[in-house]
Amino acid sequence: MTAIVEPSVTTGPIAGSSKVYRELDGVPGARVPFRRVHLSTGDHFDLYDTSGPYTDPDATIDLTAGLPARPGRVRDRGTQLQRARAGEITAEMAFIAAREGMPAELVRDEVARGRAVIPANHNHPEIEPMIIGKAFATKVNANIGNSAVTSSIAEEVDKMVWATRWGADTIMDLSTGKNIHETREWILRNSPVPVGTVPIYQALEKVKGDPTLLTWEIYRDTVIEQCEQGVDYMTVHAGVLLRYVPLTAKRVTGIVSRGGSIMAAWCLAHHRESFLYTNFDELCEIFARYDVTFSLGDGLRPGSIADANDAAQFAELRTLGELTKIAKSHGVQVMIEGPGHVPMHKIVENVRLEEEWCEEAPFYTLGPLATDIAPAYDHITSAIGAAIIAQAGTAMLCYVTPKEHLGLPDRKDVKDGVIAYKIAAHAGDLAKGHPHAQERDNALSQARFEFRWNDQFALSLDPDTAREYHDETLPAEPAKTAHFCSMCGPKFCSMRITQDVRDYAAKHGLDSEEAIEAAMADKSREFAEHGNRVYLPLAQ
C-alpha cells in the first residue's frame, strides 16, 4: 500500500485494563480478545473488546503491512448463511459464541433463520468475527470517510482505530473525495472490525458526479472492485423505485439520503426503474461469491420529524422486504437500514413493520433523532431514539456525532458519537433483558458504593474522561479512596451515610430498620451541630 502520509494511530491499553485472550477450542491458533479490568479487590472483569491488536502492548503494529490474517477461516465454501442452513458451526460462529458468551448452536440457528448476520468477506481476513442480531448484544457502527472538501488517508485510518478503541463494532467508509480506493484499502488492511461501504458513491465519482451518467455496468464493476478488496457489507438503495419518488414531493425535507437522492435523480432522468432493482439477482450472485452482506438502504428515510413514518418511507420498506427474500434465496446475508428522524411515540412501529415485512432480518438504524432542534447536540437527540429502538429489537445502531448536519466529524466527534451510542446500545440491552448486560452495571455500582474510585473509572465506557472530571476538584491521590466526592463533600455523601447505617447495625446487633432510625438520629444531631447548613466548604 502507498499513502501520501503514513498514518499514526493511538496504541496501548485503555486505562485500568489489559488485553487478554482466550484460546478457541477446535480452531488452532485462534484467540478471542477481551478487555480485562483489574479491580482493587484483586478480582477482574472481562469486557467485550473491539480494539484489535492496537490495545495489546505486545503486538507489533505495522500499518503498511496491515493486520495478520485470522486463523481458521475457510474460503470458497459458501456464505455463512448457506453453511448455517447446512447445520455447520463455522470457525467464525465458534469465535462469536465465545465473544458473546452464548451457545454456538444459538449463533448458527439465528444466522440460519436470517435473524442475524456475520459480515465477513472472504477477502477480509484481518477481522475478528462479530455478529449483528437482536438475540445478541446491540452493536454500534461508526461512519468515517473523507469528503471532497477535507480529510486525508492518514486521518481516516486514525479515526478507524480511534473509533474501535472506544467500542465501534463496525466501520463504514463513506469517502466521497479523492483517493477513495486507496483510503478504503488502508482502512480494510488495518481494521479489526467489519467494514461497510456505499458503492454508489464511488460509482458516482467515476462519472464525474453526474447521476444521469451512471449505468449498471459502472456500478457492477465498482461493487466487484470493492468485493475484491474485502468490503464486508454494502449499502444498496435498491428499494428506491420510480413510482415512490412522487411520494416525497410534499415532504418538509424531501429525500435526505445521498444514495437515495442519486438513484431518484437517475430514475427521473431516464424515466426507468432503478438499475439496482432490475439487476438485483445478478448483484446477489456477486455478493454470494465473496460472502458480502447486504445492508439494504433506506433511501427514502425521513430527514425530519414532520416526515416520519410517511407513505414514501414505508413503501420502500415493503420493497426491501421483497428484496430480502430474493437475497436469502441466493444464500446472501441481509440486514435492513432504518431511519432517521422519528419522534419517540412513532419509533416502535418502525421495528414492528420491519420485522413483519422483512422476515426479522437484523434492523440497522441511524439513530433515530427524536427531535430536530439541537444542531451540535445530535449525538444526544439521536441517542435518545437509539435507546428506544434498541429496546424494541434493533440489532445495530449507526452513530451520529455532534457534527451531524454541520460538518465532517473529527477525532473528538468520533469518540463522542461512539460513547453516546454505546450508552444507547447498552441501555437498550438492559431494557430487553439481554443476558450478561447488567453484570457490568452491577460491578460499577458496587465499586461506586465502596468508594473504589479507580475501579469506577476503569469499568466505565470512558475511563479517561471519568478520571479527568473527578480530578478537576479532587486531584490528590488520597481522593481515589476517599468516601466522598466534590458533589456532596465528606459530611453528606448518601452512600457514606448508608455505609454508616450498616456499620452501626453490625456493631450494635440491630436489624436494618432499627439501625436506620438510630443512625438517622445520630446524623440529625450531627447536622444540627454544623449549623443546619446543607453545603459545607470542601476544606471541612
From Swiss-Prot:
Pathway: Cofactor biosynthesis; thiamine diphosphate biosynthesis. Binds 1 [4Fe-4S] cluster per subunit. The cluster is coordinated with 3 cysteines and an exchangeable S-adenosyl-L-methionine. Its cofactor is [4Fe-4S] cluster. GO terms for biological process: thiamine biosynthetic process; thiamine diphosphate biosynthetic process. The keyword 4Fe-4S applies. InterPro entries: ThiC (IPR037509), ThiC-associated_dom (IPR025747), ThiC/Bza_core_dom (IPR038521), ThiC/BzaA/B (IPR002817). The keyword Electron transport does not apply. One of its GO terms (cellular component) is cytosol. Substrate binds at residues 143, 172, 201, 237, 257-259, 298-301, 337, 364. One of its GO terms (molecular function) is zinc ion binding. Its EC number is 4.1.99.17. Belongs to the ThiC family. This is Phosphomethylpyrimidine synthase.
